[in-house]
Amino acid sequence: MSKLSTTPLSILDLAPMRDDDLGAAPALQRSLDLARHVETLGFSRMWVAEHHNMEGIASSATAVLLGYLAANTSTLRLGSGGIMLPNHAPLVVAEQFGTLAALYPGRIDLGLGRAPGADMATARALRRDRLGGPDDFPQDVEELQRLLGSRQPGQNVIAVPGVDSHVPIWLLGSSLFSAQLAAQKGLPYAFASHFAPRYLHQALRIYREHFQPSAVLDKPYAMIGVPLIAAPTDEEAEFLATSAYQRILALIRGQSLVLRPPVESMAGRWQPHEQQAVGDFLGLAAIGGPEKIRARLEVLLEQTGADELMFTCDLYDPAQRLRSFEIAANLRGK
């Protein structure tokens, strides 16, 4: 039996907007369509990510979007991938996710990151100067653990809802710091290799070598992000991938991140250094037909020992995006 056939598969969604969308509503509806689709395919979980002031990403109000998705699905685990904790008071996060857990018990994850999820001007608009910064992240995680855990004698501040909910906390990151912290706290770890694969192997090694068993986890559990573009043929997948290339190129250039239709060729659309940067961004990508995808994922599992794969997929046509995840799901039976 192949490793892929027994590895949980999950989704990270940013509610991507298209260049022809009139507002965010179509993107949010597509996120729901995706959640319903992957639920039927047997995916383990779907997370949405917090980003601010990024034209083309509609998942900024992460907890609100999770409530919408959870209300319209029945079994799929849903969570944040992640909440950028420096943007929020831990008590507010505990109340939001405590509410979600009360409404949808056993289905909510709380993934936490310490990156801004925004530029400096936006960070100021979020009042981050009043909330502290990334250096406070370990203490903020501990505070969240207390707020979501069992009520302690003499505890003056409680999250209602939230206390006694024990919402599963994941630590997210693309750095060695996050790996070390997840190991120290005995928490599951998700590495952001879908856009920053450079330190993946080093981070996983640190996480596993330094892992300390905890009340929530007795051994390391690592999930890695993988960009996925699957199609019936390698040629079609390469063509469809140009939408992802254009989006990453726009990110590099500081332009709108709305999804654009695929193009026959990227020649003349990027400079050599930009092409290299896009390639680095997608260093872990699985792009191709079913057999190429299967081989790529098996290699990634062998190289990383990942316990779970979390896919991202930037395709312009919603039906082709759903098909991409369907192809990946069908590979588990082979």
Where do the PLM segments sit?
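Hydrophobic faces of well-ordered beta-strands that scaffold small-molecule active sites
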Residues: 9-13, 46-48, 78-80, 108-112, ...
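An alpha-helical appendage that flanks or caps ligand/catalytic pockets
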Residues: 130-158, 199-306
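Active-site mouth loops of central-metabolism enzymes
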Residues: 13-29, 83-90, 163-173, 281-290
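A conserved active-site cap/scaffold subdomain adjacent to cofactor or substrate pockets
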Residues: 179-198, 203-204
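Acidic (Asp/Glu)-rich catalytic clusters
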Residues: 2-5, 39, 66-74, 101-108, ...
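Conserved, mostly hydrophobic/aromatic
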Residues: 9, 38, 42, 50, ...
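N-terminal beta1-alpha1-beta2 module of alpha/beta enzyme domains
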Residues: 1-73
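Flexible, glycine-rich active-site loops centered on histidine and acidic residues
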Residues: 6-24, 86-149, 189
